Amino acid sequence: MGNCCSHGRDSADNGDALENGASASNAANSTGPTAEASVPQSKHAPPSPPPATKQGPIGPVLGRPMEDVKASYSLGKELGRGQFGVTHLCTQKATGHQFACKTIAKRKLVNKEDIEDVRREVQIMHHLTGQPNIVELKGAYEDKHSVHLVMELCAGGELFDRIIAKGHYSERAAASLLRTIVQIVHTCHSMGVIHRDLKPENFLLLNKDENSPLKATDFGLSVFYKPGEVFKDIVGSAYYIAPEVLKRKYGPEADIWSIGVMLYILLCGVPPFWAESENGIFNAILRGHVDFSSDPWPSISPQAKDLVKKMLNSDPKQRLTAAQVLNHPWIKEDGEAPDVPLDNAVMSRLKQFKAMNNFKKVALRVIAGCLSEEEIMGLKEMFKGMDTDSSGTITLEELRQGLAKQGTRLSEYEVQQLMEAADADGNGTIDYGEFIAATMHINRLDREEHLYSAFQHFDKDNSGYITMEELEQALREFGMNDGRDIKEIISEVDGDNDGRINYDEFVAMMRKGNPDPIPKKRRELSFK
């Protein structure tokens, strides 16, 4: 979480959310990887429940039972070191897969705000895990001395190191790279997250392959936000801080400024605002003068300069949004970014949910109920943002307005279709449970204990099978018996044609159609 500036609690609203973020009541729903649930070994044996684990005392940081990360992982060499913690290579004992483990010493969390920062980082990483080009959180652990975040390993190194190694670098390559970075930020903003520390060091390559995916990392300063919410903390890294951050009145537009600074560096090799001291850098940022006359700027295209100017507009209200940057002519020159409204993450998940059968939708409702507060805090904040009258439900108009605020333009028919998809009981509104089920990321289906809980919900008599009668009863409980022949649903899932669904068939249905989980300073640059 290292940075050059102070950081802490942003607003009473965010603070309250964090205070309730990972309560002891959710202790049983630990987010750290656990012993794999026992899966039935034959189609005739009922599945066994996941083995019970002895729970430790409640940790003061994550607010749930403490666990020893070394029970599941072996820690190896040091990969990096920051203000608050150290990152080590770690190996999962059960699989041999390698990850990165960020260890935060609890003795360095000296006040309530520091603890809330760590909780929020965990909540935000859970919220964003599964999104393209964002590093995945595999589990969070707390022991007596430290908090450990086990994350996807990005073994390809820092983005700018790769660029330096390549040598020659074209505007087209810069545009392609910027497109990926802005798409990451668009995803964060559409999911109600401001990164607040965007800089080249926080973009890593997944592996050393030529076409390795780019991953955004380090969400230690990130915050949840609602449209119109104003933040006051001065956070970030000096070269990349927006002027409104220095004025203590800012929102998601500050992330666009930071990317604009990165683009300027990509194109000419030095930052736009430079001085010998941090205060000198801040004064240069507040003056806002950007040099486009020194080499190599005369040879850089007018379209590139136009985009930099619009991203480094000192007035955040006039600055481009992430969606507008993606539709800028310089970004679009190779035709890869179409001039159409972009789906935000919630929109994409609603569309995916709409295509599922009712059996799978009910199973997702059950799984949603198994998730811990820290896993769904981001979605909880998004629900509250859309539920403008605080009624506990989202109406058609609130859904339309909520998606519009996230930059999604939809026809009346499209909004109605999404409403009908999420409104499982057909009462004309979306309640909290329906919203979580429809918008949680399908990577939650990787957790064996979640799948087993859902299977047990249907298997009322614990026979190890879901019968037509049990399925019909479950659909009726959730108001989702839409008249479709239960036999038709069973036949889609019943692989061995015995007229009922066993655990393996249930798991296959839940994971069908879902993407496989992935196994898991300033630089003087000169680009021609």
UniProtKB/Swiss-Prot annotation:
| Positions annotated to bind Ca(2+) 2 | D423, D425, N427, T429, E434
The active-site annotation reads D197
Per UniProt, where does Ca(2+) 3 bind? D459, D461, S463, Y465, E470
| Bilayer topology annotation | Lipid-anchor
**Which positions in this protein are listed as binding Ca(2+) 1?**
D387, D389, S391, T393, E398
Q: Name one Pfam family in it.
A: Pkinase
Q: A single GO molecular function, which one?
A: ATP binding
Q: Where is the Protein kinase domain?
A: 73-331
Question: What does the UniProt keyword field contain?
Answer: ATP-binding, Calcium, Kinase, Lipoprotein, Membrane, Metal-binding, Myristate, Nucleotide-binding, Phosphoprotein, Repeat, Serine/threonine-protein kinase, Transferase
> Which residues are listed for Ca(2+) 4 binding in this entry?
D494, D496, D498, R500, E505
Chief location category: membrane
Q: Where is this region: Autoinhibitory domain?
A: 337-367
Q: Which processes are annotated in GO (biological process)? A: protein autophosphorylation; regulation of pollen tube growth
Instruction: Output compositional bias ranges, type Low complexity.
Output: 20-45
Q: Where is this region: Disordered?
A: 1-65
Q: Which InterPro entries match?
A: CDPK_Ser/Thr_kinases (IPR050205), EF-hand-dom_pair (IPR011992), EF_Hand_1_Ca_BS (IPR018247), EF_hand_dom (IPR002048), Kinase-like_dom_sf (IPR011009), Prot_kinase_dom (IPR000719), Protein_kinase_ATP_BS (IPR017441), Ser/Thr_kinase_AS (IPR008271)
Kindly list the places in or outside the cell where this protein is found, as annotated in its UniProt entry: Membrane
Residues binding ATP: L79, G80, R81, G82, Q83, F84, G85, V86, T87, K102
Q: Where are the transmembrane segments?
A: none
Q: Where is the lipid attached (N-myristoyl glycine)?
A: G2
Q: What is known of its domains?
A: There are 3 contiguous domains conserved in the CDPK subfamily: a kinase domain, an autoinhibitory (junction) domain and a calmodulin-like domain. The autoinhibitory domain (337-367) inactivates kinase activity under calcium-free conditions.
Describe its function: May play a role in signal transduction pathways that involve calcium as a second messenger.
Q: What is this protein called?
A: Calcium-dependent protein kinase 17
